[in-house]
Amino acid sequence: MAATGEALTPQGYIQHHLTNLSVGEGFWTWHIDSLLFSVGLGVLFLWLFRSVGKKATTGVPGKLQCFVEMIIEFVDSSVKETFHGRNPVIAPLALTIFVWVFMMNFMDMVPVDWIPSLAAAAGIPYMKVVPTTDLNITFSMAIGVFLLIIYYSIKVKGISGFVKELTMQPFNHWAMIPVNFLLETVTLIAKPISLALRLFGNLYAGELIFILIALMYGANMALSALGVTLQLGWLIFHILVITLQAFIFMMLTIVYLSMAHEDH
């Protein structure tokens, strides 16, 4: 594959594909491509599942209906096995997280030059198509989960119960309150950070490998042939990675919210 636009050095090619289409500066920088693809894929998910739901029949289902029902049953069984409280929000939330994250991850399957080349032809200099390789996207989702953890912890346990959980565990003695508070606060904050960084790190590394393989197509015939083999092998392996990362994000969300519902 060739770099879009004018000829780039290997370093420039990599940097070009890892640069977001942005507006603004500093803290107020907006990554337009990440927002476009994440919101667009979210809307596609809602439209697709709503359409299947409206057309669902009790007779012989079509292939798409079977596929959607299989996903829903898989997520529902995962929630029932992991979540020990009662909350009608958890299963729809888990379904949304799993499918949405998978769809964003799946954009990594698109050859690295296709969409950036179309964007360059339209006069758009940068176009990064995998939203989950953007820390802003992964952290925004993780922070959303974090806020739900705080909300349900206070709702189920009350403010006093939540404060007690932070100050009287794991050592149930007033003299250990500072130590308990430090340990529990670090544990609480580590949850969204680990969610965000795990998803970002795996997908960013996967995208970088695809870019490095794409560089081989611009070399000699031997490297180009090797690139085809490597790309096919990595493509097959990466399907497992993107699915696993969506599943892990969903399962950790369920586990964290289940812990928030446990009244000690």
Curated annotation (Swiss-Prot):
Q: Name one GO biological process term.
A: proton motive force-driven plasma membrane ATP synthesis
Location in or out of the cell: Cell inner membrane
- Give the domain of life: Bacteria
Entry-linked PANTHER family: ATP SYNTHASE SUBUNIT A, CHLOROPLASTIC
Please give the function described in this protein's UniProt entry: Key component of the proton channel; it plays a direct role in the translocation of protons across the membrane.
Q: Which family does it belong to?
A: Belongs to the ATPase A chain family.
Kindly provide the name given to this protein in its UniProt entry.
ATP synthase subunit a
- Report which gene this protein is encoded by: atpB
